[in-house]
Amino acid sequence: MPFIRCLTALLFCVWSGIAFAEEKQTDDAPDYVGSATCAGCHEAEAAAWQSSHHAKAWMEPGPDTVDGDFGGVTFTHKGKTTRFFTRDGGYYIETTDVPGERKAFRVAGVGGITPLQQYLVETEPGKLQTFDVAWDQIQKRWYHIYGDQAPPPHDGLHWTGPYKTWNARCAECHATGFEKNYDATTRKYSSRQAEISVGCEACHGPGEAHTAWAREPEAYAKSPFPGTDRTGLPVDFSQGLQTTEVEQCAGCHSRREALLDGNPLPGTPFHDAYRLSPLRQGLYHADGQILDEVYVYGSFLQSKMFANGVRCSNCHDPHSGQLIAEGNAVCTQCHSPSANEAFPALTAKLYDDPSHHFHEPGTPGAECKSCHMIERTYMGIDGRRDHSFRVPRPDLSAKLGTPDTCNECHTEKSASWAADELEKRFPNSSHRGSHFGEVFAAARQNTTGAIGDDLLAVAKQGTFPGIVRASALDLLMPRATPEIASEAAALIGDPDPLVRAAAVALQQQVPPAEKLQRIVPALSDPAQSVRVAAARLLIGAPIAHMPDKMAKAAARASGEWQKSLQNKADFPETHLVSGGLALVMRRPQVAVRAFAEATRLDPQLVNAWVMQVRIRMAVGDMGGAQLALQRALLANPDDPNLQAWRQQLAQ
């Protein structure tokens, strides 16, 4: 039995005697019909979509889709040369594979259109990898997306590594109706999709029932498929509901972990399908500005725009993906003397004017986005803007060392200079008070004292965005005590699922009986992300005498967690979690296999290597411990932690 199945079987031994029926995998959803079918009626929308990034998110290689120079040219980076050429009508990339041998791979797919285009190669049947030398569409050149930081072979971030497996990490957001179909036993993929590229049905849902309605609307009294509307679609955007629209976009435009299979039916609530990353160090700056490749949703949730009901389509055409107006006009549709009656909280005022921005009209400094949407560059050349739409806070940047939009242009000046300038120009501004970023920065620096109280205060402040409050609770995890967990317990009933899930996680710090009592309501929470957070805390809890209703809720939540783990059996992170679970359940051999699978996928996971060494030592397998350490050092020869373990084993 593969160890992932063994582990989940052990997990469910906890529920012996409790009746639990796994959620059925039914065929009660409509079938996909393809974007070409949709275009038969929706011509204008289809025409706008044809030139969009969505339409070109994943394409078959061919003369009309491949823009890179495959004319036999070479590209050398850090001493390794890659050749791009064609043969027998195919496009090929010749490069060094993991064993160090040169090998030619046929291009199996094309990803993206601008500002760069990447190419997919099949390294084994059914498994696609994203090649890291990409085509720069602007300068018409090959370049490495990591620049001087290019990872070496055997690194998890190398183009052959698990974090670059298209099937696992990318395809669900570059295709319509994608099914990964990873077999943990054979470690093989048999992926399939309804359509490559992000087609109509990726957002609107499978169209079988809708086309039946379109053919005979008079005869279409009721959809034969549960969960579809009067026109046969699983999601209805016509009502203009913010949650419906924004959460549909957020499924891909966010840094998140899939709870389901990564391909939820459109209309599925975000927190039933995903767990959103909080404002963690390495992902976001302390003040919430984007840092790593976190996409849009996490920053948009911090914005006043989101808080006041703004939807993606207020600024972006949903079919072309382009802004609905040029330049500042996209902002002045609301931020102007006439304001916009759809958003009554707006202040009617002249913004697109030197009296507000203090720059020459027509210059970059006069553009709203220059001051309110700071830009970061990813993948070497891809500039993306922060969607928290924040008021510049150079005073905060001077304190925390966070980016300041003023200094993006005025590079010769300091943040303190910019703060002084803004104070002169806006002497009565209300935007210079305390900020959660100050608390987060102190917590990240492991400041002691009252920082726990400060984080709790942020978490309890209902006027802060939910993602900020949840992030405060997340920062409490390393310093949590039973007292802090008790203080946070009331937030398990918070209106925001991000806050509820984070408050549940903190209850790990309290005694088992008390913990169980607190998390019981969360096992039946409306959001799956909260239920799964509660299920994680059931291991070791006194569940033997649960009332039947409570036991069923616990079994359901645990089943959802089990399914979430199984859906990510090709992720190294999953096996780290699995190994930890096995240790809690006192199954050392299962734990070793889990940690070994994690390091097979990503040899740079030093902690997983160390756990293998420690467990083997604990069970008296010194030879196995020595062998695991040797393998760990081969992959990480300079790691000080592993070097220390070598000295310890040598004694």
Task: Annotate each PLM feature.
Residues 564, 597-598, 631-632:
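Canonical positions in the second alpha-helix
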Residues 435-446, 467-480, 490, 498-512, ...:
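Structural detector for internal amphipathic alpha-helices that build alpha-solenoid repeat scaffolds
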Residues 32, 36, 44-112, 118-123, ...:
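Primarily the internal scaffold of c-type cytochrome electron-transfer domains
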Residues 479, 494-495, 510, 525-526, ...:
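Structural marker of alpha-solenoid helical repeat scaffolds
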Residues 448-459, 481-493, 511-522, 545-562:
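Amphipathic alpha-helical scaffolding segments comprising HEAT/armadillo-like alpha-solenoid repeats
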